């Protein structure tokens, strides 16, 4: 976050540790501008991320989501269009939707290590963007109870 701009040097060793442990790195344009002073997803990926982790998700507000993965996999995903009330919590709910997709599709760490298929990535991004969009539709910064109930019903299908 921009409020931590002055602490980048201090946190860099921990950041590198986290990158080394990561199976997937996800961050926003703002995050990478603060940490690396770079705002191009391919530049961030090639110069800062790919050495440590091959699966990379770059979010950029209402702009397309950029995915870079193993075996030179590249794809962009549109953001779900919605009536946006607040974007606070959008990234956290994107992550929650992504994790929901991992659980729903029984995607394991080994599967991630071997490289996900395009269909698997598509499904993960589907849930990530749905959760994020739902969160943005009100002032509470998390998904609605109705949306959560709908998603819960899909787990057993």
Protein language model annotation of sequence segments:
Residues 1-43, 63-64:
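Conserved beta-alpha-beta core of the PfkB/ribokinase-like small-molecule kinase fold
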